[in-house]
Amino acid sequence: MPPEAWNPKPSGRGRRTRRDGLDNTALRHRVDSRVGGTIGPMSDHVRGKVIIVTGAASGFGRLVAEKVGAKGARVVVADIDAAGAESVAAAIRAAGGEAIHRGTDVTDRGDTTGLAALAVDTYSAIDVLVNNAGIMPLAFFSDHAAAAAAWDRCIDVNLKGVLHGITAVYDQMIAQGHGHVVNISSIYGNVPVVGSAVYSATKAAVNVISESLRAESQGRIKVTVVRPTGVPGTGLGASIVNGEALVGLVGQNMELFRQRATVVFGAGSPDAKAEFTDPEKITYWAISPDELAAQVVYVIDQPWGVSISDITVRASGEQYLF
């Protein structure tokens, strides 16, 4: 049976008609009305929240900032690229949202403290911090000469940057009686893999820091770890030192991975590309930044009493092992 036989034809993006005449959106509304749930269109727990997003001048961080801004959050756009952060904040305001910006180097504790102070001075609260800034210098130990500086930077941004962000908002969140820290980790932090010693170590550290914060702050600060798999288009690929180091995460699937990548990003026909780039299909190959950003918004868009503490976001047809 061909793969497409497993995929019901959608009547529109995100809408499927059932035998009882309900599409999936209508069904979600029915479930919400019966059990008082907060899923889907009924949820409105982003509006009014003060949300700091780091690494938000471009790529995935920008998408998160724009999406929460569109849902009524008061957004603090932070990035080492101050002009880029200013542009994103301006775009949110132009779309009818509320946003400010600050040029912020998350490796500098003073910068992150200043970022938190700006949020409090402007909005009198910090409800959510999205620790998103990060780099991914994949390389083997044999690449140490070429990778040394990138590895140092990786530790500073991915590990120290997360810690600086947490400590910058911690006192304010405790004082106001609630808060939510969303740390962007990775499946690379799940297990040791070749070609990713330093990057994986930083993400494993983020997982441990997150769980420690959750345990120390129960009933006061919610903590969510988001573990994406491969997400082309976020800009992370630009920091890879040795592309062959991807082998650690795909292992024996490397050849198939390359074939799929060639179809999706290279010489594939429109029909072939659609087979692997349509999230409505079970063969969906790589999570898009937009799809991932939507999941981050989802974990924020919960009542204060509900905490989604850990979420792994995968494409169902991917080749990653862990």
Please report, for each region that a protein language model flagged, where it lies by residue.
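Conserved mid-core segment of classical short-chain dehydrogenase/reductases
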Residues: 136-152, 195-198
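Residue(s) in the substrate-gating loop at a strand-loop-helix junction
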Residues: 186
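The beta1-alpha1 cofactor-binding region of Rossmann-like NAD(H)/NADP(H)-dependent oxidoreductases
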Residues: 82-83, 103-115, 148
